[in-house]
Amino acid sequence: MQLQLICEDPSQQSHLDELAARWQLSHTDESDFALVLTAERLELRKVDEPKLGAIFVDLIGGAVGHRRKFGGGKGQAIAKAAGLNKGATPTVLDGTAGLGRDAFVLASLGCKVQMVERHPVVAALLDDGLARAKQDPEIGTWVSERMSLIHASSHDALDQLAQDREFVKPDVVYLDPMYPHPENKKKSALVKKEMRVFQSLVGADLDADGLLEPALALATKRVVVKRPDYANWLNEQKPSMAIETKKNRFDVYVKASMA
């Protein structure tokens, strides 16, 4: 993957070089996207649209921190979908981790969550945000214990894990594929910004239907698929049940009870 790689703090240039090597990123002046290492964090910027601002992973403050404190605990839809309301604390593989928000919610409720992000730039942002969260005095201990990023940013990462006999299969596989966003649907300013940048960088997950089969092969208890309320079932496969919110629904494919 080629994009602009910019280091604002010269003392951290070697860190940016390591990061680029890990995620197989290389510099080009031609790209409209810049991955910028500031003194505080790693950011993604759309060079030709500076008003959009920077995208970065913040698991400590902002909307994520607010949701951790006031988000409704195990009563919220994602927790019910993952089976936490049954008294279980399942292990989870988030197969489309993105900026890590849903994985963080599940981890904050006690789940051990392994994350896979197929796009290397997004994975690099997530890795950086996770490293900062692990240093935080309030949440660092349990983030370190419960959240990990699997360094697999290929499109067949789930297939590879399903076939790996050494890999301990999770109770739950969680999927939230990028879905084409209709213009007439209202979104918050932050989500709009992120969607615009991501969809121009990553594109919609046009192969998302292909994620369901390996997810079902990996999960021992259930697969949870987050969908916009207007979207079809993933791979046109009817779920065992659906948990609906105002704008989304969680389609749940049950393989075994959570007990």
Curated annotation (Swiss-Prot):
Which domain of life does this protein belong to?
Bacteria
- Where mainly located? cytoplasm
The enzyme's first-digit EC class, named in words, is transferase
State the GO CC annotations: cytoplasm
Q: Which Gene3D superfamilies match?
A: Vaccinia Virus protein VP39 (3.40.50.150), YhiQ-like domain (3.40.1630.10)
Subcellular location(s): the record lists: Cytoplasm
**Protein family:** Belongs to the methyltransferase superfamily. RsmJ family.
What is the name of this protein?
A: Ribosomal RNA small subunit methyltransferase J
Catalyzed chemical reaction(s): guanosine(1516) in 16S rRNA + S-adenosyl-L-methionine = N(2)-methylguanosine(1516) in 16S rRNA + S-adenosyl-L-homocysteine + H(+)
Binding positions (S-adenosyl-L-methionine): 101-102, 117-118, 153-154, 176
User: Taxonomy-wise, where does this protein's organism fall, top ranks first?
Assistant: Bacteria, Pseudomonadati, Pseudomonadota, Gammaproteobacteria, Vibrionales
What does the UniProt record say this protein does?
Specifically methylates the guanosine in position 1516 of 16S rRNA.
From the UniProt record, which GO molecular function terms apply?
rRNA (guanine-N2-)-methyltransferase activity
Q: EC number(s) of the enzyme?
A: 2.1.1.242
Q: Enumerate the UniProt keywords alphabetically.
A: Cytoplasm, Methyltransferase, rRNA processing, S-adenosyl-L-methionine, Transferase
The cross-references to Pfam families, in alphabetical order and at most eight, read: SAM_MT
InterPro entries (alphabetical):
16SrRNA_methylTrfase_J, SAM-dependent_MTases_sf
